[in-house]
């Protein structure tokens, strides 16, 4: 006894048959069949795809027979296809552009044929299949429910684990759940897309086929985990994460971080040492995150104009490659402890002259951003971390040239053991004594270093003499050790640029000496009569003058520019402070002085003794003839009483007045060309 339905018939795949029980016998009936044809799915009779039963095809009998070449396009009435039993077609071609197709059902697609997606539309494959001719995604999107792997799932939606999936013409393989696949992936001409939302683990590897532009595009928020070697022309990570789990790296390849915070992660295998010359590009407007192998020599290029977060993941990961063409932002970060605390080893002299380097606060004295004794350029510098001249791959006094990106920036961390050169036209703001406290030196050759801490009492420019030269400028309020102002160098107390010079207030305190050679420039300013401005409502006090305070000596042979704001009304006897100098003032400076109101002129004679220049009565004639050699002078009191007459010269005037027994005070000296006010001390 038993049921016919319990009998399993083998070896007749692709043939229509039936079983019947007659006269005590089990009879196997085979149906006649036509030759295979090329036909199109119509779906006129519904969704069922079966063998020689349902008239849903454009074939001569409107049914499907084994070996038929099938095309699925936008002309079908029904696009939800139910595979009712095992079927063995020749090849399947999905040429839908507008309609969405879905293959489902209890039956499987068998045989040696291939499944080809050639339109621009979407195809879902939800059933389990066993065809072996490969899957070719030449456009559009193919979404399988399952993928086969050699660790538990023999067959999936796209056949067995060794059934190849080929991506070309920018076709998309989309996976909407986490899974593991052992299918080999081949990239054909114009490459393809893998779009996954969960974690897709590829054990079968990725290799290049024939053609050009065999690029792989990673889409979707999920992680694409590569457990075998991946070969491609270019990998574009547009979304999500690519995890190089197999530790084989991408030597010589180019990876483009082409999205928003997309991630490239290497297996952090600290027990094996590797070398990788992978090239990374971050286009303008894009951002990415890179977790490199913590024990690998990276020698590839970094290019682009976007933003990249690079994590230090261990202690033996030197970045030796040429990043000099990168014009974006590098956020240097520390990863989590992995046996040892990670450090960042920048280990080359190519530098990053066009990039902004942002050093994270987690880089400390013990776990630093290391420059390994290499001298190189940094386009702009920001962040709050610790930069060391040492490292695992070298040490020694190096030179960091900072500013060539020609942008304004501020760094709140610290530079240690390195000599520093400021270049570029931008402004580097320093707001703490700590930034350069342990640097070897600072030289400003272009642009501006702006001090931004009025209360500073220790040097903000390093523990040695600051050199300012070429087109460099020291500006702001704060403290510096000593200043050597060379040709082209500018010293400007106050926070404003030349265009707003008359608004400048505040003091630059020079602990030691100031030396300004010919061709250098010093700018000072006065905004009010008193040096301190008091707010009438709050009582708060702010500086009203911009000048220099020198703890040592000042030797000045450059040009001194004196300006004032219209909130100060100059009067006879007023003065402008240029220097408050504890030591001596010497030299032969040239003065460029803002014009005074009519009837007044500047008197620079007190400068070398007092660090000030004064406002005097003007005759309208330069120096009232005092620059013409010997002249006769009549001396009067302020009240107009004549005291004496004498022959003198400009150089000897003050001493000759004293020799006449005149007491300290203010007098009027008249010549044939006019008169001036002089003050004896």
Predicted features and spans:
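Glycine-centered tight-turn motifs at strand-turn-strand junctions
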Residues: 642-661
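Acidic glycine-/aspartate-rich tracts in secreted/extracellular proteins
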Residues: 2, 33-34, 45-47, 61, ...
């Amino acid at each position: 006894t038993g049921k016919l339905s319990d009998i399993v018939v083998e070896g007749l795949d692709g043939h229509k048959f039936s079983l019947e029980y007659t006269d005590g016998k089990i009879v196997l009936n085979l149906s006649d069949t036509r030759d295979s044809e090329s036909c199109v799915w119509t779906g006129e009779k519904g969704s069922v795809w079966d063998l020689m039963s349902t008239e849903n095809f454009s074939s001569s009998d409107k049914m499907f027979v084994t070996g038929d070449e099938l095309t699925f396009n936008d002309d079908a009435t029904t696009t939800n296809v139910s595979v009712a039993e095992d079927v063995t077609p020749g090849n399947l071609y999905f040429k839908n552009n507008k309609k969405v197709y879905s293959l489902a059902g209890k039956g499987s697609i068998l045989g040696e044929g291939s499944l080809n997606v050639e339109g621009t539309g979407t195809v879902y494959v939800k059933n389990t299949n066993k065809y072996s001719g490969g899957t070719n995604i030449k456009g559009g999107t193919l979404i399988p429910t399952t993928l086969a792997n050699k660790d538990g799932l023999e067959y999936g939606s796209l056949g067995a684990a060794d059934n190849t999936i080929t991506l070309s013409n920018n076709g998309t393989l989309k996976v909407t759940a986490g899974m593991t696949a052992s299918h080999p992936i081949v990239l054909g001409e114009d490459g393809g897309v893998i779009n996954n939302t969960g974690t897709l683990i590829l054990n079968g590897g990725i290799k290049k086929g024939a053609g050009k532009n065999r690029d792989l595009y990673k889409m979707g928020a999920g992680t694409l985990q590569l457990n075998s070697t991946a070969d491609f022309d270019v990998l574009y990570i547009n979304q999500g994460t690519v995890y190089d789990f197999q530790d084989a790296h991408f030597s010589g390849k180019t990876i483009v971080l082409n999205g928003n915070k997309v991630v490239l992660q290497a297996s952090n295998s600290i027990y094996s040492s590797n070398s990788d010359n992978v090239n990374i590009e971050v286009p303008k407007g894009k951002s990415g995150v890179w977790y490199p192998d913590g024990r690998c020599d990276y020698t590839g290029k970094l290019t682009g104009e976007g933003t990249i977060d690079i994590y230090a993941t261990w202690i033996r990961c030197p970045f030796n490659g040429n990043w000099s063409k990168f014009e974006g932002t590098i956020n240097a970060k520390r990863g989590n402890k992995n046996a040892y605390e990670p450090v960042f080893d920048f280990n080359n002299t190519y530098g990053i002259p066009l990039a902004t380097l942002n050093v994270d606060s987690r880089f400390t004295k013990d776990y630093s951003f290391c420059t390994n004794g290499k001298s190189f350029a940094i386009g702009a510098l920001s962040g709050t971390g610790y930069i060391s001249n040492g490292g695992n791959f070298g040490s020694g006094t190096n030179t960091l040239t900072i500013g060539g990106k020609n942008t304004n920036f501020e760094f709140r961390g610290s530079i240690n053991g390195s000599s520093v050169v400021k270049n570029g036209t931008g402004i580097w703001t320093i707001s703490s004594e700590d930034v350069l406290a342990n640097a070897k030196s600072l030289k400003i050759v272009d642009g501006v270093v702006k001090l931004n801490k009025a209360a500073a009492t220790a040097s903000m420019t390093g523990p040695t003499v600051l050199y300012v030269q070429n087109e460099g400028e020291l500006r702001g309020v704060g403290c510096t050790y000593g200043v050597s102002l060379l040709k082209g160098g500018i010293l400007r107390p106050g926070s404003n640029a030349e265009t707003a010079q008359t608004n400048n207030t505040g003091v630059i305190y020079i602990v030691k000496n100031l030396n300004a050679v010919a061709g250098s420039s010093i700018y000072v300013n006065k905004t009010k009569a008193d040096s301190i401005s008091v707010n009438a409502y709050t009582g708060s006090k702010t500086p009203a003058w911009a000048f220099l305070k020198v703890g040592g000596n000042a030797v000045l042979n450059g040009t001194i520019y004196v300006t004032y704001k219209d909130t100060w009304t100059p009067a006879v006897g007023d003065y402008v402070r240029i220097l408050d100098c504890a030591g001596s003032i010497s030299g032969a400076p040239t003065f460029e002085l803002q014009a005074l109101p009519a009837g007044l002129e500047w008197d620079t004679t007190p400068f070398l003794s007092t660090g000030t220049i004064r406002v005097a009565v003007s005759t309208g004639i330069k120096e009232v003839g005092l620059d013409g050699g010997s002249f006769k002078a009549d001396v009067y009191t302020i009240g107009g009483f004549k005291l004496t007459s004498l022959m003198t010269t400009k150089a000897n005037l003050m001493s000759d007045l004293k020799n006449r027994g005149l007491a300290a005070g203010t007098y009027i000296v008249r010549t044939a060309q006019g008169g001036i006010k002089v003050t004896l001390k």
